[in-house]
């Protein structure tokens, strides 16, 4: 089951570090690109960096050998030698070259990230996230099975050595945070966050948080997330973190465990999404509350 994971864990960190350095440098220039028209400012943001970073990541994955090329690629953008990978495979490698493109493009924050994860239809097996401008030299998040590491980069050492030296995040028996990130409810996010807060949890919007979803989940600042039709490029990392901490991700309409056997293509945004509303939390009691509050909300993204 772990066939590509050994190769990815050994080879990918240095490439992601290089991609992060490129993103830091390109951000100083006029790199905005048009072409997306879904109606969501976050979804429609696109830069030359997204395209360039994906080109690098795909080329590096291609050159890792046949084990990796036998995987299927799901990439947020269309650049790179994607035809070298399997059209059908048990394994999927999902790439978000720049998560948080709008803030990256507009230079209004430092929580953008280079992300990749490996999954099967059942669950996520490996996730790697690098935030180039968090901390002095960037911040790493790696999830491998149930082991999470989170911490600062050190360019004096190899990327793999840095990750190996980071202490694992230990799941707390109970986490003090009740914060739930609410996202994807087009035009209704504030309303949905208030509904979550009315249950005793603390529904928050992305703009009100001090960083990226993924390290905030791993550190315990956020206990979970409630997303409408999340995409398959970045949100699965949130699911992976939650599960590694002893939590879960479920569909709110029936409370069943989320897998990747059912997806749909959002033609407006030109991306693949999970259907319906997904609740994800490291605290399973919070999950039950989220299912109760959101069960009757519309699963349709565009109405």
Identify the meaning behind each predicted range.
Residues 85-151:
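DPxDG-like acidic metal-binding loop motif
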Residues 165-208:
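Short loop->beta-strand "edge-of-pocket" segments that line small-molecule binding or catalytic clefts
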Residues 1-98, 295-303:
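N-terminal subdomain of lithium-sensitive/metallo-dependent phosphomonoesterases centered on the IMPase/IPPase/PAP
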Residues 23, 50, 61, 101, ...:
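Residue-level signal for inorganic ion chemistry
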Residues 1-14, 194-303:
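Oxyanion/phosphate-interacting regions
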Residues 123-124, 148-151, 155-158, 284-288:
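Short helix-loop capping/hinge motifs at secondary-structure junctions, enriched
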Residues 84, 149-176, 254-272:
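Charged, glycine/proline-rich intrinsically disordered loops and linkers
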Residues 76, 130, 228:
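Conserved residues at the C-terminal ends of beta-strands
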């Amino acid at each position: 089951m772990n066939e590509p994971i050994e190769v990815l864990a050994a080879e990918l960190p240095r490439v992601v570090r290089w991609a992060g350095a490129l993103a830091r440098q390109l951000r100083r220039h006029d790199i905005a690109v048009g072409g997306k028209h879904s109606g969501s400012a976050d979804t429609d943001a696109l830069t030359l960096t997204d395209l360039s970073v994906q080109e690098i990541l795909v080329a590096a994955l291609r050159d890792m050998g046949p084990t990796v090329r036998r995987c299927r690629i799901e990439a947020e953008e269309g650049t790179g030698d994607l035809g070298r990978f399997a059209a059908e495979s048990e394994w999927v490698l999902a790439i978000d070259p720049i998560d948080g493109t709008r803030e990256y493009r507009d230079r209004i924050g430092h929580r953008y990230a280079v992300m990749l994860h490996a999954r099967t239809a059942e669950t996520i097996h490996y996730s790697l996230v690098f935030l180039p401008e968090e901390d002095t030299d960037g911040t790493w998040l790696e999830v491998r099975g149930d082991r999470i590491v989170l911490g600062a980069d050190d360019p004096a050492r190899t990327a793999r050595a840095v990750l190996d030296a980071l202490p694992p995040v230990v799941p707390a028996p109970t986490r003090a945070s009740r914060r739930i990130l609410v996202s994807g409810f087009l035009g209704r996010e504030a309303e949905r966050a208030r509904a979550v807060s009315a249950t005793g949890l603390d529904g928050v919007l992305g703009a009100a948080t001090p960083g990226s979803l993924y390290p905030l989940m791993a550190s315990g600042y956020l206990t979970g997330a409630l997303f409408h039709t999340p995409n398959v490029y970045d949100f699965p990392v949130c699911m992976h973190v939650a599960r590694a901490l002893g939590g879960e991700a479920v569909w709110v309409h029936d409370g069943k465990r989320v897998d990747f056997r059912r997806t749909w293509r959002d033609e407006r945004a030109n991306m693949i999404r999970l259907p319906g509303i997904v609740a994800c939390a490291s605290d399973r009691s919070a999950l039950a509350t989220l299912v109760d509050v959101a069960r009757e909300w519309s699963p349709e993204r565009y109405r």
